[in-house]
From Swiss-Prot:
PTM-bearing positions, type N6-succinyllysine: 10, 23, 220
Catalysis: reaction(s): urate + O2 + H2O = 5-hydroxyisourate + H2O2
Organism: Rattus norvegicus
EC number per UniProt: 1.7.3.3
UniProt subcellular location: Peroxisome
Gene behind the chain: Uox
Protein name: Uricase
Family: Belongs to the uricase family.
């Protein structure tokens, strides 16, 4: 028969590993008006705080709790007074506020996603106040800071869906009694990029670096516009993106990438007396292959 403790505060058999509380998905649209020229940042922000005391968990004592509604209001007010130059800077502002304003907060963790609005543009002329939603990659960041420590800053790209109709293959893999997959020299390659990297310090043009990483991802996936670039595996493309990124962007310390292999299969039309030469394909959402990898700069040799 199971035995239960009535006094959880005196339970010596468990210990806290990590605690936190906060507010998720606090949405803000910030408008910067410079005369008739307007700029916008729409974000969704999630904040988690860790407190020095655990008395709220142990005894139901809420005297140290900053209400999550207050956290939401703080995000709104910081957007007003600090603006949102970049989502990374905004996340650091939020961390700094809670750590400097409340001595019993020991850790602040802030995640921000930016809605992908792009200014209307035609023939090189930019509209002064109109924007279009362009879901060609979501900019996100993750900033964590402990008391008396520097902010640990990650940025990333997600929901960047790309496809090429050739210059991809998959050959030379292990074949056993359960293998039915044929080798292919030419196939469609489609994926939805998730990419996350860590900065070495905070003195970075975050917007420019994010754009540079996105350009590298597209460059290594697609190759030259007139002929493309062959990919022998998703793994090779993933690694090539990482190596080029770290070689060109010294402010980045490490990079994680996840590339699902989204399948498009040739539809068999032989029963209808037709030959389908990879012209009509069937998209399959799942199951799908998933390839991941993280690289970092090597530490200098001590020899």
């Amino acid at each position: 028969m199971a035995h239960y403790h009535d006094d959880y505060g005196k339970n010596d058999e468990v210990e806290f590993v990590r605690t936190g509380y906060g507010k998720d998905m606090v949405k803000v649209l910030h408008i910067q008006r410079d005369g008739k020229y307007h700029s916008i940042k729409e974000v969704a922000t999630s904040v988690q705080l860790t407190l020095r005391s655990k008395k709220d968990y142990l005894h139901g004592d809420n005297s140290d709790i900053i209400p999550t509604d207050t956290i939401k209001n703080t995000v709104h007010v910081l957007a007003k007074f600090k603006g949102i130059k970049s989502i990374e800077t905004f996340a650091m502002n939020i961390c700094e506020h809670f750590l400097s304003s409340f001595s019993h907060v020991t850790r602040a963790h802030v995640y921000v996603e930016e809605v992908p609005w792009k200014r209307f543009e035609k023939n090189g002329v930019k509209h002064v106040h109109a924007f279009i939603h362009t879901p060609t990659g979501t900019h996100f960041c993750d900033v964590e800071q402990v008391r008396n420590g520097p902010p640990i800053i990650h940025s990333g790209i997600k929901d960047l869906k790309v496809l090429k109709t050739t210059q991809s293959g998959f050959e030379g893999f292990i074949k056993d009694q359960f293998t039915t997959l044929p080798e292919v020299k030419d196939r469609c390659f489609a994926t939805q990029v998730y990419c996350k990297w860590r900065y070495q310090n905070r003195d970075v043009d975050f917007e420019a670096t994010w754009g540079a990483v996105r350009d590298i991802v597209l460059k290594k996936f697609a190759g030259p516009y007139d002929r493309g670039e062959y990919s022998p595996s998703v793994q090779k493309t993933l690694y090539d993106i990482q190596v080029l990124t770290l070689s060109q962007l010294p402010e980045i310390e490490d990079m994680e990438i996840s590339l699902p292999n989204i399948h498009y299969f040739n539809i068999d039309m032989s029963k209808m007396g037709l030959i389908n030469k990879e012209e009509v394909l069937l998209p399959l959402d799942n199951p799908y292959g998933k390839i991941t990898g993280t690289v970092r700069r090597k530490l200098p040799s001590r020899l």
